[in-house]
Amino acid sequence: MYSPKEYWAGLSERYDSVDSSGLLPILHPEAPLWFNEAIDHIQFRALRRAVEIANFSPGARFLDVGCGTGRWVRRYRELGFSPVGVDATLGMLRVARSHQTACPLAAGLAYNLPFSNDAFDCISDITVVQHIPYELQPEALREMTRVLKPGGIMILLELIRGAGFHIFPRRPEDWIREAESFGVTLIDCFGQEYFFPDRLFAGLTQTLFRRRGSQARGQVMSHDSSSKENSLTRRLYWQMRRIIVPFSVLMEPVFVNILPASAATHAIFVFRKKL
């Protein structure tokens, strides 16, 4: 039985002492650091675009829901805003503080936020609600709109394909419809993490191993694999991806501008709360 709080607590305990970057427990835990840094880079690029679209005033009060190890609240502060982070996992908040996150941090659930109504100019949710079971996702979106000021901005970066044990994506139109049911209006939406060359290579590699009739070996290609007996295969696999991923990162802005959000892995949604 999947429990978001227990799942993330387990990751924070597992990587607290071995990951100085703070990226592994919040992105792809079993992937190499360079891969997580590439994902972090394109996510930050997409988030900057969303922030520019919203045109916030300096000092705007941001709430980062599911702040994890604090990477976004630190960046919001660098951009001149006044961020607050909230996360359900005390271990994540402890890691955030160890990274000199000089912002208020609070413990709380996305679907039961410990803040008053209309408290923030912006709510950001970066790959958080996608990890909440479907039946609780509407409550999380309701809570985020509740603490957002009228006229304020809500930025969501969520998965739109690839469901899994702890991943509950929606199609772009479903994310939009669900959020708008709580009193916000979409002002922009664009894709994030197209990564076509890398997705093609990863998909073909997994298909190859499945066709050889070894499901276990096929699983070694996933981000979450730690199979020791296939360590050589896994190293070769990631060495190939290290060649392909930089090209995917380079092409990302091109794909963002010419392809629909539905062709990407994630989408960014920028909403404004009705006055």
Regions found by a protein language model. Give the residues of each.
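Conserved class I S-adenosyl-L-methionine
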Residues: 1-55, 59-66
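Class I SAM-dependent methyltransferase SAM/SAH-binding core
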Residues: 69-112
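A conserved beta-strand element that flanks and buttresses the S-adenosyl-L-methionine
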Residues: 124
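A short glycine-rich, Lys/Arg-flanked "PGG" loop and its adjoining helix->strand segment in the class I
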Residues: 138-150
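Conserved beta-strand signature within the Rossmann-like core of class I S-adenosyl-L-methionine
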Residues: 151-158
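Short alpha-helix
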Residues: 168-183
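A C-terminal cap/extension of S-adenosyl-L-methionine-dependent methyltransferases
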Residues: 196-275
